[in-house]
């Protein structure tokens, strides 16, 4: 059976791995998940990530980050879902916790944070929020 929301699955795996204090988590890879992991690493929410395996069954290995034995990611929420897509213009990009968190946006220029999308004057689909 196919997965209906692979991005939500990735976020749930990260959330569950952090609850049991795992150092890393394996997720089936895709270009979009790779881009989301790249944004998470740039913003300091994960330590690193790599892709392992052959073409048909690539695995994205995400190394999680902790501070004082607590996960760096406090809340990870999927916003745009297959059942309800959320698209925003550059002026409507939401802020998370008054700028303490980030939103990840898929734009025509690639996957980026909401702040970068605002700076580049592009809108897109709001994938998730992290703080």
From Swiss-Prot:
A Pfam family annotated for this UniProt entry: Ribosomal_S8
Stretch forming the signal peptide: none
InterPro entries: Ribosomal_uS8, Ribosomal_uS8_CS, Ribosomal_uS8_sf
Biological process according to GO: translation
Gene Ontology cellular-component annotations: ribonucleoprotein complex; ribosome
Tree of life domain: Bacteria
Keywords annotated in UniProt: Ribonucleoprotein, Ribosomal protein, RNA-binding, rRNA-binding
Subunit structure: Part of the 30S ribosomal subunit. Contacts proteins S5 and S12.
Function: One of the primary rRNA binding proteins, it binds directly to 16S rRNA central domain where it helps coordinate assembly of the platform of the 30S subunit.
Protein name (record): Small ribosomal subunit protein uS8
